[in-house]
Amino acid sequence: YYFMCGINGFNFKDIALIHDMSKITSSRGPDNEDYFSSENYTVGHNRLAILDPDKRSNQPFIYKNLILSFNGEIYNYLELKKILIEKGYKFLTTSDTEVIIKLFHLEGIESFKRLSGIFSISVYDKSSEKLYLIRDTIGVKPLYYHYNSFSKKFIFSSLIRGILISLDSKRLNYDAVHSYSNFNRNDCRETFYKEVFKVLPGELIQVQNGDFKRKNFLDLKLKKNYNEINIKADISTYFGKQFLSDVPVALSLS
């Protein structure tokens, strides 16, 4: 059972650790596993290929000084690709991956506001040594992180278990457990483990020189005064975009 790609990374160099983390997230992507590493950044990716299954779209995806690793789908990538082509960008793949990184190259973090889809994205800028993490407004695609204020080490992963293997102490967060047991959900930043946190839906995290900051960046835009015809038309449009794929598609209802 595959969940669409896994991403792992941290702001230091440790090849053994990225391999161990990638093994933990391997169930999320059977089609390719790879990593990028420098002295100040390491990132790995487990790929479940949906668009452009060719190896040219494997991740981490590098364009100039940018390194991208993401999990998800961008439903409006063809429209965005057209805009980029008009700006003079050329494309070597037919994936949404290349669209994300080149749009970021053009517009920086403002590019995230153009994306329609479900995603957890990591972008690293080698020139500024700055890491960006962002998650879609609904929070469909998971992304977790750990930050040690003493060592300045920052670690992120699609799975909590991917982070736990790097921690010396694994302590339960009883407040989060209590919240879940009472309400059958946990919408807070905290997870079941202390010192492991969620990137919240729509949140942007920036890490540079061992320091990180976070802010709400993407807002869920709700339209008022909708009539039944408009709702049906929008549902039909969005469903159509979600069926874009270069591999067989199935629909399961439960």
Locations of the language-model features?
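Cysteine-centered catalytic environments shared across enzyme families
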Residues: 3-254
